[in-house]
């Protein structure tokens, strides 16, 4: 479709105004029916026909030229469609071409005249016009304030014919210390706040220029350093740029959205910026890494902590990058007795609304999305920011803080898009390119300033030389002037007689009589010497690029020394700021219960209250038919749980990913968490907090094979699992424990035989090996349990003195805690068992009845009370899922041949399936108090 436009070369005054008329009827233009979209467009952009209030003879007569068949309609003006030169005023053009050209023209107008800053002075046109208008009004940093309305009116009337709100908003932003790293305007009155409070009306607020602005942007404005262009009505001129001495674009940053393009440049520290500029001056081939040594990253006016340097490197290298900013916080202890703490927010990320942040946190707490917070209040005042978030008793401040980072704007990202206007075109630039572009501009400014000063000095020197000639020939000059009948003849006579120029002659005529003394002559002579010296220096400066760069550096350092202030944003290189699930999940203690059928569930430790020895216990939950509890252990949420199967394969999963269930729930099938094969059962679980290099896993099979593997081999496990041990036929992996070379291993068979051996005696092997024989088993006997004796208790193993039975109860730990399948148990001092090598029968540790056998053995006595007794607790689980939690100190200390005491009355609960220990530090004191009352 073609669009009719007027020929721009033909003035509109050369022809009468044209009246638009569609002239379209269905009968005359049937071809338009095929292009309904074009018809709709034409009808939408063409005004409806109106009656012309003039004589018929003066009305326009139109005729149809034709329809080109593609929907293009050509209308010509009969008789009056030609200009005086005979040229037609109707221009035929394609609609898509005209739309493209018009849109590009509009886009470039927005880019260059409104939205994007210039790389050279770092200002958008509106900011540049505001500063220049204030400079013209004489609002220097040492002059009194003037109303902002006066400044806005000056800008609107002379330079920026747009809305007053846009101009005032731009002025306000340049005065806000939380918006600009180095404010360019000093405001007096209400200029808004970090809570997004609006500023007062312009008739109430006052402003003036900052001293930094005068020194950095306006110092050389009157010395022909930049070009001046006509303003919008050609009534006066305005600067196209300001002669910046420091890269203001990097100092205060910029943000703006144009047509199809945007910019977002972070602010930086003045001192670091000048140092980086100096480094580039001394070494134009400096790499980005070398520049980063002087300017390591952005410096935001609101402070905060910049997380990681990868985004900074990418932004400085390519112009695009993502900088993660966190608010600066501190943890305060509110009550030392209850250990209640509070998170104090002292700084927030750049461009974050403080009031909205507080409101968001309150909403999260109210909706129970953010847990552990009891109160929040804003205590900010003139002295600084202080947001207090009080935590509930027992809440982990680190977890609450990580949740704040993830759920609120306390951690936000600044997306760098360093686009600026360079040579009249928008361009994406990195750090070095921005600095180099500024240096090129600054060199031009210094050269133009030097040429301006040189021209003035030469002109003045020329005048001074003429005056000195006149003073040297004073009598002749006076006679010549007295003889002349007019000023013009006097000037002409002086030029002719003394070979002076017109300006020199005029200067002599303008001298007053008081300046004809000898003293004044000496002053002119000294001035001439000074001018010649200045001219020589300026000529030398203009002939040396090195001196120009040196002067640029000196002027930048002068501004740095005068206006520098310390960095506000801290840099944290070790943390990228990316939060994972583990960062927002409390590292609380939890209980894991696994059944033989492969069901697992996670419960809180207080699910089972402490009970007395010999009680029935509490059910751990409903079990499937023919299912029984397999393992029951204590771990923490952040632990990495290693699952070892009966086939010698190991799997891995974070503890917090196991669904939390109630005590009566059946649990989650392990096949939903792990990639188990058909018929594969999990027989042992090891929670690992850290994969230390000096730690090993000791593996023991049912048939008595043992081996030791470095824990590091299991740090990375694929989802399908890896081999942990090679098994012989009819054997299965049953027990896995974590140990070091200085520890000891205690193994026991179902018949009660016990072997103690140093871990160092066990060879360290790879994963895909079988191991060696752990102990000699009699016919029908099998390994029943295994535990580790830490090196800290080694001294107790050296006790080999025979102690009588009456002394056992008063003997301190450590002890071996034996638990039989029928619910009996006892403690035997470790000192009653001597160490032996592998592949031995061992010593008697338990005397069983004919229908009973050993279920588990533990080393207890790690934590002792003031009375020398154990503070640990043991959790017993029966085959039917009943759980009993009792104190270890309530279990009797007996000889190796004793049967023990009743720990749990099983009745119809079957046999003891598994047992686990809970340390004293992990026990809940409220449970202990409840048990004491019940007893």
From Swiss-Prot:
GO terms for molecular function: ATP binding; DNA binding; DNA topoisomerase type II (double strand cut, ATP-hydrolyzing) activity. It comes from Nicotiana benthamiana. The lineage of its organism: Eukaryota, Viridiplantae, Streptophyta, Embryophyta, Tracheophyta. A motif (GyrA-box) lies at residues 611-617. Made up of two chains. The A chain is responsible for DNA breakage and rejoining; the B chain catalyzes ATP hydrolysis. This is DNA gyrase subunit A, chloroplastic/mitochondrial. GO terms for biological process: DNA topological change. Residues 1-28 have a biased composition (Polar residues). Its main location: plastid. Residues 75-85 have a biased composition (Basic and acidic residues). Residues 116-584 form the Topo IIA-type catalytic domain. One of its GO terms (cellular component) is DNA topoisomerase type II (double strand cut, ATP-hydrolyzing) complex. Residues 1-29, 44-85 are annotated as: Disordered. Pfam families: DNA_gyraseA_C (PF03989), DNA_topoisoIV (PF00521). CDD domains: TOP4c. SMART domains: TOP4c. A type II topoisomerase that seems to play a critical role in chloroplast nucleoid partitioning by regulating DNA topology. DNA gyrase negatively supercoils closed circular double-stranded DNA in an ATP-dependent manner. It is an enzyme of class 5 (isomerase). It catalyses: ATP-dependent breakage, passage and rejoining of double-stranded DNA.
